[in-house]
């Protein structure tokens, strides 16, 4: 299948340099960009579909790096249907699960948390709501998960893990488990700030994050309760290369502060943007 988009207006290549595309036309073949150039170089008979952008702006699809999938385009937490399809209207074409923690009666035993992650990964591998790519199946870290469990999960296609909702006595108890998950090749996101749902840690602060060294400090501007200004400074200055995930469901003042810190310390490449929706707190 060949689709040509012509007469593109302003464009953005998705980098911090904000460079425009090298042309006003794009050709996609079998779902991937195959060519970028001038509209004048295209012939109508060479492509099955030609879309005239009529000067519209073209940017890469946006990625929501923190949402909570269950199964299907539905969450029982707010009894909401079709939210992923709705997000597509805002330009989001890819979503990354921050665990299936909102599944009613979710298991917390070793076998159950692995099964839940694998089931979610498999379901969304075969299901794209309105074409949105969903990376689901984020294993919720529990104290009894071992290095062998993480290796098994990775072989089974699970590559995401979430710290913050397991039955750990203190945030520091996560440290060896997070490190074992990362050693197996999983990308670990850690809940940051105050607790959001019953049964989770009351707070995961800078000390614990720096000790854990997750790949991503999830909703680092609060989910919904933010860290202190001093902790923000520590995460930015001492926490390299931990990604700093800012969410719309968090604290706006803290998000601005973190952006200012990242800019001042040359850490803008660590900033991620996400929604953290559907939220645990409504």
Predicted regions and their residues:
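N-terminal metal-binding scaffold of metallo-dependent hydrolase/deaminase domains
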Residues: 1-45
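Residue-level marker for buried hydrophobic side chains located in beta-strands
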Residues: 4, 61-63, 188-189, 273
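Divalent metal-coordination and catalytic microenvironments
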Residues: 8, 26, 31, 55, ...
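Metal-associated gating/positioning segment near the N- to mid-region
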Residues: 48, 52-116
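Active-site mouth loops of central-metabolism enzymes
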Residues: 65-78, 133-146, 193
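Short, acidic/polar
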Residues: 76-84, 142-153, 199-208
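Divalent metal-dependent hydrolysis catalytic cores, especially in the metallo-beta-lactamase
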Residues: 83-112, 127-141, 155-168, 186-189, ...
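Active-site core of metal-dependent hydrolases
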Residues: 158-281
């Amino acid at each position: 299948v060949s689709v040509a988009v012509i007469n593109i207006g302003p464009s953005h290549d998705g980098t911090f340099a904000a460079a425009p595309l090298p042309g006003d036309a794009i050709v996609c073949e079998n779902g991937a960009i195959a060519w970028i150039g001038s509209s004048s170089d295209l012939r109508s008979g060479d492509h099955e579909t030609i879309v005239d952008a009529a000067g519209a702006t073209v940017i890469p699809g946006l990625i929501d790096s923190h949402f909570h999938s269950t199964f299907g385009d539905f969450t029982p937490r707010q009894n909401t249907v079709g939210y992923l399809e709705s997000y597509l209207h805002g330009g989001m074409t890819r979503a990354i699960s921050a665990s299936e923690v909102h599944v009613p009666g979710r298991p917390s035993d070793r076998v159950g948390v692995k099964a839940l992650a694998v089931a979610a990964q498999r379901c969304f591998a075969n299901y794209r709501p309105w074409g949105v790519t969903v990376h689901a199946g984020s294993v919720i870290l529990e104290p009894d998960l071992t290095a062998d469990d993480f290796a098994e999960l990775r072989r089974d296609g699970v590559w995401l893990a979430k710290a913050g909702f397991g039955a750990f006595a203190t945030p520091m108890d996560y440290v060896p488990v997070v490190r074992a998950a990362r050693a197996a090749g999983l990308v670990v996101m850690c809940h940051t700030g105050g607790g959001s749902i019953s049964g989770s840690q009351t707070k995961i602060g800078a000390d614990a994050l720096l000790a854990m060294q997750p790949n991503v400090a999830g909703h680092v501007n609060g989910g919904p309760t933010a860290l202190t200004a001093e902790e923000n400074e520590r995460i930015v200055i001492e926490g390299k290369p931990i990604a700093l995930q800012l969410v719309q469901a968090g604290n706006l003042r803290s998000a601005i502060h973190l952006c200012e810190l990242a800019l001042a310390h040359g850490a803008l490449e660590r900033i991620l943007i996400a929604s953290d929706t559907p939220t645990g707190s409504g």
